[in-house]
């Protein structure tokens, strides 16, 4: 066969990164590589590039920012690209998408408003955008770039009145640049009419205080002449007092700024990134939130949470905290729903479904049953058999069942069990939960007992099943008339746990303690003390007297035979030696340690030395 005409295309950088992303959508480095590769298509995508290259870059930006909407720098790059290839309107559309995705970014609002200043001749539209930005980021401790741009805009418009109003607003906010803004405010206020410096009622009070003071008396020879104040002197005195009022505001803001500087100075990464934050950063955010919550200003608390959730967007604990704090505020339940929705739909990984389950519980609490059910179903679409979601859905069906009819709750459990998408451990837990519905909710004790007994042979490894089975029998009503029957049933379950199950030794020991407490505290038969002491010896005594463990070592043999053989072979009972297994490399102590609940790591010396 002639292979000369066959051409195998070499994988491009773009194809390589795209393939990596398709394989792992959470590979951030691959995403950044794909953006770079897209930007360099055809030697660099620009106005003269092919439509295919331009649309490819747009598509990559859309995909990337859809997954990581908090990357303000990439929104800026996307907007600049659109301005270059399609004009101001297309660029503005990207900025609008950007501030919808990250509405509390000082940098993005500053860039957007600067763009609007240069491309829009309607001052009112630009001013309106600045006002929106001020409401979103104006309280940010590091918002001075935005405020500087806002002041620059009003100066360009030759609106000193607006400049003064902005500065008057700024001197009340604890900011990194608070002192600079106060100095500028003092400077600008000197040229402002006195009527603009304070509210009319405050000015009237100051004027009354000034005019109430006695006039100056000047000596002229032997005469004393009273000099009445003129308006200029009154205004000069009023301005001095107004300055003192503003100075008090400055000192208060200075104190508030100093309080926050303790936390602000510890923020090393104020922007979003997928890299983990170190514990010191997380602790600082927790303490900062504690501080603002104690201060009690609703707007400042909300803004700090939003700042925190830019940096800590991938940490579920802060989403939980924000939602819980907001739920304690009067008339803000809709905001709680929005917080849960943002976390669930964008930021919290599906591999950690806890925030989604909490969202479903919140929706159910508000009567939104269909919404809650849809949340559980969406989790199970991505994580088939997720226990938290399944049990949440079952709980929803149980709580909202008409006339306590649990048909739907059982149907959810059994359909998921029968689908076979769960691992064995999850399936066993779901079977147990199905039985517990019959026991605890429907109250059909006989049916529940039969279900426990029927499933017991298949669930010998399931800790949850056997804990539930034992508790089921322990919690049945006990009185003097049914003691014998009650004890027999509890004892039967305990016998299966100790001799038939394959549970870890620690679990068996814990369940045995429960049974011993039952014997000691709920029995009215003195003879059970013999059983109590026998179990105590068998569970807590030295291994040489634990007869049940001998049986497990050599099942099916007579107890005396096992004891005699082990003693003669090993010098003491308790460890069964098999020469063939030793030669193959298996430690004779392995089973001993396993039954003790200890992992054995010793390798037989014969095998280790290579002897045969």
UniProtKB/Swiss-Prot annotation:
Gene: prp39
Principal cellular location given in the protein's record: nucleus
Keywords: mRNA processing, mRNA splicing, Nucleus, Repeat
InterPro entries: HAT, TPR-like_helical_dom_sf
Organism: Schizosaccharomyces pombe (strain 972 / ATCC 24843) (Fission yeast)
Protein name per the record: Pre-mRNA-processing factor 39
GO biological process: mRNA 5'-splice site recognition; siRNA-mediated pericentric heterochromatin formation
Gene3D superfamilies found in the cross-reference section: Tetratricopeptide repeat domain (1.25.40.10)
Family per record: Belongs to the PRP39 family.
GO terms for cellular component: commitment complex; spliceosomal complex; U1 snRNP; U2-type prespliceosome
Location relative to the cell: Nucleus
Ranges of the HAT repeats in the UniProt entry: 158-191, 367-399
Protein task: Function prior to stable branch point recognition by the U1 snRNP particle to facilitate or stabilize the U1 snRNP/5'-splice site interaction. Has a direct role in the assembly or function of a catalytically active spliceosome.
PANTHER family registered for this protein in UniProt: PRE-MRNA PROCESSING PROTEIN PRP39-RELATED, PRE-MRNA-PROCESSING FACTOR 39
């Amino acid at each position: 066969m002639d292979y000369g005409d066959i051409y195998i295309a070499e994988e491009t950088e773009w194809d390589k990164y795209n393939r990596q992303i398709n394989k792992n959508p959470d590979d951030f480095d691959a995403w950044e590589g794909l953006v770079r590769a897209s930007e360099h298509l055809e030697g660099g995508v620009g106005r003269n590039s092919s439509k295919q290259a331009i649309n490819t870059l747009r598509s990559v930006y859309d995909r990337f920012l859809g997954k990581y909407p908090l990357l303000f720098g990439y929104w800026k790059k996307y907007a600049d690209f659109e301005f270059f290839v399609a004009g101001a309107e297309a660029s503005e559309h990207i900025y609008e998408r950007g501030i919808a995705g990250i509405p509390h970014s000082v940098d993005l609002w500053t860039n957007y408003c600067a763009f609007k200043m240069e491309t829009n001749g309607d001052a009112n539209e630009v001013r309106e955008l600045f006002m929106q930005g001020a409401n979103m980021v104006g309280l940010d401790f590091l918002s001075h770039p935005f405020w500087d741009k806002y002041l620059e805009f009003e100066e360009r418009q030759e609106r000193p009145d607006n400049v003064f109003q902005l500065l008057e607003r700024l001197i009340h906010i604890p900011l990194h640049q608070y002192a600079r803004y106060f100095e500028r405010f003092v400077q600008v206020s000197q040229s402002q009419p006195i009527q603009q410096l304070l509210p009319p009622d405050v000015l009237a009070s100051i004027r009354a205080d000034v005019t109430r003071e006695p006039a100056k008396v000047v000596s002229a020879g032997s005469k004393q002449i009273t000099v009445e104040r003129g308006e200029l002197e009154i205004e000069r005195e009023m301005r001095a007092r107004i300055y003192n009022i503003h100075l008090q505001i400055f000192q208060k803001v200075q104190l508030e700024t100093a309080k926050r500087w303790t936390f602000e100075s510890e923020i090393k990464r104020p922007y979003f990134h997928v890299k983990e934050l170190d514990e010191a950063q997380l602790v600082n955010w927790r303490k900062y939130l504690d501080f603002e919550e104690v201060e009690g200003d609703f707007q400042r608390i909300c803004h700090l949470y939003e700042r925190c959730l830019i940096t800590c967007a991938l940490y579920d604990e802060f989403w939980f905290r924000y939602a819980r704090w907001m739920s304690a505020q009067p008339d803000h339940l809709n905001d709680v729903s929005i917080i849960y929705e943002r976390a669930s739909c964008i930021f919290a990984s599906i591999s950690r479904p806890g925030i989604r389950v909490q969202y479903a519980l919140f929706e159910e609490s508000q009567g939104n049953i269909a919404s809650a059910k849809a949340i559980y179903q969406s989790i199970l679409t991505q994580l088939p058999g997720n226990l938290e979601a399944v049990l949440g859905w079952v709980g929803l069906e149980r709580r909202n069942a008409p006339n306590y009819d649990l048909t739907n709750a059982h149907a959810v459990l059994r359909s998921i069990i029968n689908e076979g998408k769960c691992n064995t451990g999850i399936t066993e837990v779901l079977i147990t939960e199905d039985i517990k519905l019959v026991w605890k909710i429907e109250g059909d004790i006989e049916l529940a007992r039969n279900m426990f007994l029927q499933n017991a042979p298949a669930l010998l490894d399931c800790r949850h099943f056997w804990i539930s089975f034992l508790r089921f029998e322990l919690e049945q009503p006990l009185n003097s008339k049914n003691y014998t029957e009650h004890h027999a049933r509890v004892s039967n379950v305990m016998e299966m746990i100790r001799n038939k199950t394959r549970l870890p030794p620690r679990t068996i020991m814990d369940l045995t303690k429960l049974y011993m407490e039952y014997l000691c505290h709920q029995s009215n038969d003195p003879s059970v003390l013999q059983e109590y002491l026998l179990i105590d010896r068998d569970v807590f005594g030295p291994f040489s007297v634990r007869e049940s463990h001998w049986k497990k070592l050599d099942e099916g043999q007579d107890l005396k035979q096992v004891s005699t053989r082990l003693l003669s072979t090993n010098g003491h009972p308790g460890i069964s030696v098999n020469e063939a297994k030793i030669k193959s490399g298996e430690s004779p102590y392995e089973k001993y340690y396993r039954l003790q609940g200890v992992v054995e790591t010793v390798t037989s010396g014969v095998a280790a030395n290579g002897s045969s």
